[in-house]
């Protein structure tokens, strides 16, 4: 395992518990490192900076199956989060990317989440697994309603002890 001293600038420091890019920092020097670490109150991850900054792919997963992928880009920031003003569009995974997702899904059971990839020299690089990702970005780029998709609702019903009640708007 590398230590923080083993990384050369620039690199990314991010909280293990952050969401929406709020605790993700691009660090160019010792002062920026200290400032970033002072804002992170829990465990953190350090990542080498990929060559294609401001661009990543989120793969939406339900029941350990790929639902859809979305390409996120930003012209103003190294963070491409939709919630921070990044743009989004549907994305078709290539065979290499599908194979990477399947390897991850073989090791982890993802009931509902996202698998994120950044790009280095034009090639997808695994970034992180997000639990309980928001679906607003997905709704903005395609017709899938991830909460009402028949197969998704059926998967939830088949894998949890609770059933729909008066608060459920889906009819099976």
Residue ranges and their predicted role:
Residues 23-26, 36, 57-58, 70-71, ...:
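A short secondary-structure junction signal
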Residues 40-42, 51, 62-76, 81:
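Catalytic core of tubulin tyrosine ligase-like
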């Amino acid at each position: 395992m590398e230590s923080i001293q083993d990384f050369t600038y620039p690199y990314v420091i991010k909280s293990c518990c952050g969401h929406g890019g709020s605790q993700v920092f691009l660090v160019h020097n010792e002062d920026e490192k200290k400032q970033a670490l002072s804002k992170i109150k829990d465990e953190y991850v350090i990542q080498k900076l990929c060559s294609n900054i401001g661009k990543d792919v989120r793969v939406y997963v339900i029941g350990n199956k790929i639902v859809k992928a979305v390409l996120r880009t930003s012209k103003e920031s190294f963070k491409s989060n939709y919630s921070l003003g990044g743009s989004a569009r549907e994305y078709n995974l290539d065979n290499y990317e599908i194979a990477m997702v399947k390897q991850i899904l073989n090791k982890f059971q993802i009931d509902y989440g996202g698998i994120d990839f950044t790009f280095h020299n034009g090639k997808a690089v695994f970034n992180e697994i997000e639990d309980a990702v928001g679906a607003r970005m997905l709704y903005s780029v395609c017709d899938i309603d991830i909460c009402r998709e028949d197969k998704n609702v059926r998967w939830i019903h088949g894998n949890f002890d609770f059933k729909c009640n008066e608060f459920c708007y889906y009819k099976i």
